[in-house]
Amino acid sequence: MTKMRESEIIRMFIEEFDNHALGDDAGFVRFNDSWLLVTSDMLVWRTDVPDFMTPEEAGKKVVTMNVSDIAAMGGLPLAFFFSLGVPENTDEKTLRGIAKGINKGAKEYGVKIVSGDTNEAREIIIDGGAIGRGSRLLLRSNAKPGDLVCVTGELGRPLTALLLWLKGEEIPPKILEKAKNPKAREREGIELSNYANSAIDISDGLSKELWEIARSSNVRIVIDEDKIPVNEEVREIVKDPIKIALASGEEFELVFTIPKENLGNISFDFTIIGRVEEGEGVYIKREDKMERLPILGWEHLKGGDYVNL
């Protein structure tokens, strides 16, 4: 059994590859006067699909996961492809539901399903991929001192839904809807490509994503606890809503850093939660105290758990 975390495995592979530029939400190669973006993201039934989610919702989620990666790079999603691992005892209803969900997601985001593969597996695995195009890329490594740190949407619902489900408690409809049917911010990503310096999607938790930007850009990020956009229902349900908002993964909201003078050009709703400074690390301001922010969020291969939660 491996003793390495998911993030450690990723870093190890990047070290072995000649292309050390890997590490963003999507890979990219120059294609004429634009960038060709390619990403892949996998959904494994045992770890990624709680029983409150239908096969159709799971199929659509795989498309969302991959489109979100393209959006975080500031790209226009164009195509979706996937490989499907299927146990031999899987019923047709489940497979048909997955197929309908993939098609529904492709229609919603305006991407074409261009390729697929199927093989036998011990459990259902959907390994999705997306192709996109961008003119100006949003990289995790391009945050600049003086940038403001912003986030789209409200945070906390997916993790709240998961924790309630694990405890066997009823999940309020609006909390459940975000967990079952997340949305990629593809339009926002395209707009941000003109004005922001860096971006990342919240797939593993706000805390982890902020650390990714800080490390990749060699900067210090300071956020204000009072400015984190926690969903109101989450505040009413959980004991520590800020911690939940910082750790909640599969939000697929965008975190971005942007020069202050460019804020007026943004047409969608967002929340300013902090700033980028010279230095290193991620810090959170709580009342009059400044604390180093722990890395909270989902981590595969350590029991599949939310680390430090």
From Swiss-Prot:
Binding-site residues, substrate: D48, E250, W298
Broadest EC class assigned to this enzyme: transferase
UniProt-listed Pfam families: AIRS (PF00586), AIRS_C (PF02769)
Reaction(s) this enzyme catalyzes, per UniProt: thiamine phosphate + ATP = thiamine diphosphate + ADP
Sequence positions that bind Mg(2+) 5: D204
Chain positions recorded as ATP binding sites: G116, D117, R140, S203
Pathway membership: Cofactor biosynthesis; thiamine diphosphate biosynthesis; thiamine diphosphate from thiamine phosphate: step 1/1
Record's keyword terms, sorted: ATP-binding, Kinase, Magnesium, Metal-binding, Nucleotide-binding, Thiamine biosynthesis, Transferase
GO biological process terms on file: thiamine biosynthetic process; thiamine diphosphate biosynthetic process
Binding site for Mg(2+) 1: S40, D41, D117
Function, in words: Catalyzes the ATP-dependent phosphorylation of thiamine-monophosphate (TMP) to form thiamine-pyrophosphate (TPP), the active form of vitamin B1.
Note: Reaction mechanism of ThiL seems to utilize a direct, inline transfer of the gamma-phosphate of ATP to TMP rather than a phosphorylated enzyme intermediate.
Protein name listed in UniProt: Thiamine-monophosphate kinase
Source organism of the structure: Pyrococcus horikoshii (strain ATCC 700860 / DSM 12428 / JCM 9974 / NBRC 100139 / OT-3)
Name of encoding gene: thiL
